[in-house]
């Protein structure tokens, strides 16, 4: 019943977004919000918007959804924003987009509404200061977090008395031991994404970052340590050759990893936070109660590193309702909203204190493990609009061909 108590609290916070004594708050304003696809839980966003509307009777909020993947959403948003379309006031955007979109002149600076970058971003994990502040301007506000996690078959590691691997080499050895013991030719050791999608960029960066290498210099310019990059790719290649990763990895997309792990065909799987509920709650999941979460292994002599993602709220530079839109964005970035999304939808908080909230811990126990991964994963990818994603994706997508 505690979940139901969150809504009145949110309604109170939503009401505080209206400035006392202003008449404009009671003039009918319609805000149109793009709130992503199914994985971004537009159903929960609708509940939050309803609370905001109840506390702000002069505001009506309409939702637009679309795009099953961040790539499809990015294609759509780029088309709309490039056309300077004012039909949508607020956008939910991926963590890699604020710098791109702000640099293109598509996003409204929020400093006048949320304060200085230091003040606005103080409650949030440091990665969101890095991704949402561009040239001293607040380009977007954090909505909810995401990160790549290492999911694993807890029952199989217990069966073979194997501890959580700390390095990729240890994971490969553990996989081979379990594969041999199970005698199932269809059992994969590790599932990663190698198809030409954003996940392949993270696949490339995980062993690269683990070696202590950065992808951006202090000015934001793309840099690449070729020796570390080759070493990381060779790590994946060796696991393909050993039969730990399947040979057609260049075809594997995010849903493929989820579905194969659910079907009991994978021992270790790298995927985003949303996958946890899929493994735990989907009716066709064969691994319910058998899944563990651990930090991603490191390269030998390196450190664990993960790809932190998440979704941000931004105001369109072409909106005709910027002030009202900014008020709604501010509400959607509050700790109370973050708590609601965590309890109701298992969406990872962008605010560290929410991870230890008693209601959150009770409702989503696995967050106690997730917190360490997200907090430690202070990395993100910042690329200008013109950077070809293929520059990063191609090396990963070619792994299976190199192993033939």
Please provide the spans of the model-predicted regions.
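Glycine-centered hinge/linker elements that transmit conformational signals in sensory
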Residues: 174-179, 219-250, 296
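Conserved C-terminal helix/tail region of periplasmic/extracytoplasmic solute-binding proteins
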Residues: 60, 158, 180, 241, ...
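Short, well-ordered beta-strand elements
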Residues: 28-38, 59-64, 89-90, 139, ...
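Hinge/lid segment of periplasmic solute-binding proteins
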Residues: 95-147, 163, 172, 183, ...
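Extracytoplasmic "Venus flytrap"
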Residues: 31-47, 66-70, 146, 198, ...
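Short, polar/charged alpha-helical segment
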Residues: 39-60, 393
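C-terminal lobe and pocket-closing loops
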Residues: 273-288, 299-395
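Extracytoplasmic "Venus flytrap"/periplasmic binding protein-like
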Residues: 50-127, 133, 155-166, 259-260, ...
């Amino acid at each position: 019943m505690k979940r139901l108590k969150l809504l009145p609290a949110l309604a109170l916070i939503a009401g505080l977004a209206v400035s006392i004594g202003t008449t404009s708050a009671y003039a009918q304003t319609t805000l149109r919000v793009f709130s992503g696809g199914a994985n971004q839980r537009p159903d929960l966003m609708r509940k939050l918007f309803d609370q905001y509307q109840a506390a702000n009777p002069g505001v009506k909020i309409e939702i637009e959804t679309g795009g099953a993947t961040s790539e499809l959403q990015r294609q759509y948003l780029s088309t709309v924003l490039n056309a300077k379309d004012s039909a949508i006031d607020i956008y939910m955007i991926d963590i890699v987009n604020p710098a791109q979109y702000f640099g293109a002149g598509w996003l409204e600076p929020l400093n006048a509404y949320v304060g200085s970058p230091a003040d606005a971003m103080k409650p949030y994990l440091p990665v969101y200061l890095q991704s949402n502040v561009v040239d001293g301007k607040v380009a977007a506000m954090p909505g909810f977090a995401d990160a790549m996690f290492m999911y694993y078959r807890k029952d199989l590691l217990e069966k073979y008395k194997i501890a959580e691997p700390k390095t990729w080499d240890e994971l490969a050895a553990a996989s081979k031991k379990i594969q041999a013991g199970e005698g199932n030719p269809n059992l994969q050791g590790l599932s990663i994404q190698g198809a030409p999608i954003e996940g392949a960029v993270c696949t490339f960066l995980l062993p690269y970052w683990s070696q202590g290498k950065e992808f951006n210099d202090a000015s934001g310019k793309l840099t690449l340590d070729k020796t570390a990059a080759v070493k990381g790719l060779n790590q994946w290649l060796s696991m393909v050759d050993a039969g730990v990763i399947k040979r057609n990895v260049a075809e594997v997309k995010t849903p493929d990893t989820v579905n194969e792990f659910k079907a009991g065909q994978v021992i270790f799987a790298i995927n985003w936070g949303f996958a946890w509920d899929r493994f735990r709650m989907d009716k066709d999941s064969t691994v319910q109660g058998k899944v563990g979460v651990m930090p991603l292994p490191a390269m030998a002599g390196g450190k664990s590193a993960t790809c932190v993602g998440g979704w941000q709220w931004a105001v369109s530079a072409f909106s005709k309702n910027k002030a009202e839109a900014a008020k709604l964005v501010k509400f959607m970035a509050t700790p109370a909203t973050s708590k609601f999304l965590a309890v109701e939808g298992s969406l990872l908080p962008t605010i560290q204190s929410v991870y230890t909230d008693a209601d959150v811990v009770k409702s989503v126990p696995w967050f106690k493990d997730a917190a360490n991964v997200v907090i430690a994963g202070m990395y993100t990818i910042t690329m200008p609009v013109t950077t070809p994603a293929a520059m990063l994706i191609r090396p990963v997508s070619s792994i299976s061909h190199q192993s033939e």
